[in-house]
Amino acid sequence: MASGVTVNDEVIKVFNEMKVRKSSTPEEIKKRKKAVLFCLSPDKKEIIVEETKQILVGDIGEAVPDPYRTFVNLLPLDDCRYGLYDATYETKESKKEDLVFIFWAPDNAPLKSKMIYASSKDAIKKKFTGIKHEWQVNGLDDIKDRCTLADKLGGNVVVSLEGVPLK
């Protein structure tokens, strides 16, 4: 069921910037987004970038020691969101980076919000061409353990996520 919600051009721009890894200067790399959340506009007619809910590659280290944990902490406990997370992980063979589309619909979000976000999900997914991994998350228990994301990325072949070895 389509909701009639549109996707703001800035959302598509952010996705394309995260998807395309062109050779960049160190300064440009620091400004690249590692993770970003998208929400519905106040009038519920458009999916927009949630400007204050993002992690830049340049922040990783001192300001953001663990980007995965920081991303989880950006998620609101009482409302839905869409997210893009640029996962850096290692398999037994090689290092990899993949974008993960996350539909966050916590159990205690208002029913109306869950319905609008669920029915608008296809609108944003259609704009995110080439995404290999999609994950619907319904609560912190589903997302707080990085092993769950590792399973989505490649099951038992993933040995570390964001430089942290998996147990």
Curated annotation (Swiss-Prot):
SUPFAM superfamilies: Actin depolymerizing proteins. Residues 4-153 form the ADF-H domain. Keywords: Actin-binding, Cytoplasm, Cytoskeleton, Nucleus. GO terms for biological process: actin filament depolymerization. A motif (Nuclear localization signal) lies at residues 30-34. The keyword Repeat does not apply. One of its GO terms (molecular function) is actin filament binding. The keyword Transferase does not apply. Gene3D superfamilies: Severin. One of its GO terms (cellular component) is cytoplasm. Coiled coil: none annotated. It is found in: Nucleus matrix; Cytoplasm, Cytoskeleton. Its main location: nucleus. Pfam families: Cofilin_ADF. InterPro entries: ADF-H, ADF-H/Gelsolin-like_dom_sf, ADF/Cofilin. PANTHER family: COFILIN-RELATED. Controls reversibly actin polymerization and depolymerization in a pH-sensitive manner. It has the ability to bind G- and F-actin in a 1:1 ratio of cofilin to actin. It is the major component of intranuclear and cytoplasmic actin rods. Belongs to the actin-binding proteins ADF family. This is Cofilin-2. It comes from Xenopus tropicalis.
